[in-house]
Amino acid sequence: MTIAVGRAPSRGWFDVLDDWLKRDRFVFVGWSGILLFPCAFLALGGWLTGTTFVTSWYTHGLASSYLEGANFLTVAVSSPADSMGHSLLLLWGPEAQGDFTRWCQLGGLWPFVALHGAFGLIGFMLRQFEIARLVGIRPYNALAFSAPIAVFVSVFLMYPLGQSSWFFAPSFGVAAIFRFLLFLQGFHNWTLNPFHMMGVAGVLGGALLCAIHGATVENTLFEDGEGANTFRAFNPTQSEETYSMVTANRFWSQIFGIAFSNKRWLHFFMLFVPVTGLWMSAVGIVGLALNLRAYDFVSQELRAAEDPEFETFYTKNILLNEGIRAWMAPQDQPHEKFVFPEEVLPRGNAL
């Protein structure tokens, strides 16, 4: 009789690491976690450090930290000075030369937070893709999350790369983002840009669809008893459907004369509207980075210049944009030492 003794195949370090990363634990790590967790930690830590201690005096001539008296709405990690160009401002680079204090003064925390934040968001998207594959579902969550990533990358990275320096990127703070919005309007007439319109339609349309869908499901929950509440419908172990798609279809058919006939098309539409809107707005921001113009109704501007009694909402907005540029530029870019004489400041046709 012959006895064959089997030997377990040897496992390499990659297999061991793969098993450890994908082990079932309270917080899943995975291969995506190698990118996500360090980058998210460093981005958040850099932002908290900057908003707590670091001034923007040397980059924007502003106070921007809790230490200087700013509050949650006015603190920011500000973008570097215009003179820094598109330098990555590495701590060990020629600008800071390993001096941490000088690095903070030059605005080194901004590219640190921006790049680690971008890679952290990408890591989170890859995390959704990885877990979806392990669980055995489609990766549409990752696809949906690509939309805010596209907006972040286009606004914080692509736009300033198309301009003269990182200075023109938004700083990381609430009031700083508002300043950036005013800048986009004044210098690019962003609200009249069709890509911005598609973005607004996507975000508000997605919110509307979400509200309508949630209300419709609540309205058509199957009744569990005589009571007014139907909380047993939230039991995750129930085998039957929670709500009636047929009843919902009948309701909206009576409201609009048309309704979604199946859940797949309904939920795909809820995915498509906001994701497409955000992607289109990201494309529009890349266009602004290249200083592309959108709608210019020159005929209206020429007629308004010739006829003091002719003015449209478009020509009024053009005057407002001129005002933003004229009054914002000296405050926003003090290093340029702009001086605008009174006669070139914008005046409305009625003045």
From Swiss-Prot:
Main subcellular localisation: membrane
Binding locations of pheophytin a: Q128, N141
Biological process terms in GO annotation: photosynthetic electron transport in photosystem II
Annotated residues for binding of chlorophyll a ChlzD2: H116
InterPro entries: D1/D2 (IPR055266), Photo_II_D1/D2_sf (IPR036854), Photo_RC_L/M (IPR000484), Photo_RC_L/M_CS (IPR055265), PSII_PsbD/D2 (IPR005868)
Places the protein is found: Cellular thylakoid membrane
Keyword annotations from UniProtKB, A to Z: Chlorophyll, Chromophore, Electron transport, Iron, Magnesium, Membrane, Metal-binding, Oxidoreductase, Photosynthesis, Photosystem II, Thylakoid, Transmembrane, Transmembrane helix, Transport
A Pfam family: Photo_RC
Membrane topology: Multi-pass membrane protein
Highest taxon in the source lineage: Bacteria
Disulfide bonds: none
Positions that bind chlorophyll a PD2: H196
Gene3D superfamilies membership: Photosystem II protein D1-like
Amino-acid positions noted as binding Fe cation in the UniProt annotation, renumbered to this chain: H213, H267
More info: 2 of the reaction center chlorophylls (ChlD1 and ChlD2) are entirely coordinated by water.
UniProt xrefs under HAMAP family: PSII_PsbD_D2
Function, in words: Photosystem II (PSII) is a light-driven water:plastoquinone oxidoreductase that uses light energy to abstract electrons from H(2)O, generating O(2) and a proton gradient subsequently used for ATP formation. It consists of a core antenna complex that captures photons, and an electron transfer chain that converts photonic excitation into a charge separation. The D1/D2 (PsbA/PsbD) reaction center heterodimer binds P680, the primary electron donor of PSII as well as several subsequent electron acceptors. D2 is needed for assembly of a stable PSII complex.
Family: Belongs to the reaction center PufL/M/PsbA/D family.
Binding partners and assembly: PSII is composed of 1 copy each of membrane proteins PsbA, PsbB, PsbC, PsbD, PsbE, PsbF, PsbH, PsbI, PsbJ, PsbK, PsbL, PsbM, PsbT, PsbX, PsbY, PsbZ, Psb30/Ycf12, peripheral proteins PsbO, CyanoQ (PsbQ), PsbU, PsbV and a large number of cofactors. It forms dimeric complexes.
Protein name according to UniProt: Photosystem II D2 protein
Organism ancestry: Bacteria, Bacillati, Cyanobacteriota, Cyanophyceae, Nostocales
